Amino acid sequence: MRVLGVDPGLTRCGLGVVDGSNGRKVRPIAVDVVRTPPEMDLGSRLLRISDAAELWIEQYKPEVVAIERVFAQHNVSTAMGTAQAGGVVALAAARRGIPVCFHTPSEVKAAVTGSGNADKAQVTAMVTRILNLKTAPKPADAADALALAICHCWRAPMIERMARAEAMAAEQMRKYQAKLAEMKKAGSR
């Protein structure tokens, strides 16, 4: 499975592509950071991120895009910019019919380090080790993008099993409710 991991941000948006195979084997394909200057107007910044995402999607052909889920941050404008950057990448994927999954920072940290409270240095060290890289990806946004891709490769089988279980439960509930309605109808005759 080829995954494009995205650490969204207006100033720095990390992009990382990883190939995952059976088990926990992952292989790095590409990593970079899209930068936009703060003095550039918002529309131009989002367009630059969107253009880069579209280029990466065309070039690397991911099967899924994994984006860091924005959570409450102290700085509202930072959270808004992060959400907007993630949104344009999600839209680029959706236009091509590529599934988009969101993972929280703690899910990503737990997947690659074993602790949802790991710091950026620990995440970078583990990404470097897991992918057998000669040098650590820099800046941290690049390492985070790779961590998102790794996290998705490792969590995807569980996510699929949960989705199948939920679908089966919904189907069982539908059948049960239909049978109840049938029994109720028969009882009122």
From Swiss-Prot:
The RuvA-RuvB-RuvC complex processes Holliday junction (HJ) DNA during genetic recombination and DNA repair. Endonuclease that resolves HJ intermediates. Cleaves cruciform DNA by making single-stranded nicks across the HJ at symmetrical positions within the homologous arms, yielding a 5'-phosphate and a 3'-hydroxyl group; requires a central core of homology in the junction. The consensus cleavage sequence is 5'-(A/T)TT(C/G)-3'. Cleavage occurs on the 3'-side of the TT dinucleotide at the point of strand exchange. Keywords: Cytoplasm, DNA damage, DNA recombination, DNA repair, DNA-binding, Endonuclease, Hydrolase, Magnesium, Metal-binding, Nuclease. Binds 2 Mg(2+) ion per subunit. Gene3D superfamilies: Ribonuclease H-like superfamily/Ribonuclease H (3.30.420.10). It is an enzyme of class 3 (hydrolase). Its EC number is 3.1.21.10. InterPro entries: RNaseH-like_sf, RNaseH_sf, X-over_junc_endoDNase_Mg_BS, X-over_junc_endoDNase_RuvC. It holds the Pfam family RuvC. It catalyses: Endonucleolytic cleavage at a junction such as a reciprocal single-stranded crossover between two homologous DNA duplexes (Holliday junction). The keyword DNA-binding applies. One of its GO terms (molecular function) is crossover junction DNA endonuclease activity. CDD domains: RuvC (cd16962). Mg(2+) 2 binds at residue 68. The keyword ATP-binding does not apply. SUPFAM superfamilies: Ribonuclease H-like. This is Crossover junction endodeoxyribonuclease RuvC. The active site is at residues 7, 68, 141. PANTHER family: CROSSOVER JUNCTION ENDODEOXYRIBONUCLEASE RUVC (PTHR30194:SF3). GO terms for cellular component: cytoplasm; Holliday junction resolvase complex. It is found in: Cytoplasm. The gene is ruvC. Its cofactor is Mg(2+). It comes from Rhodococcus erythropolis (strain PR4 / NBRC 100887).
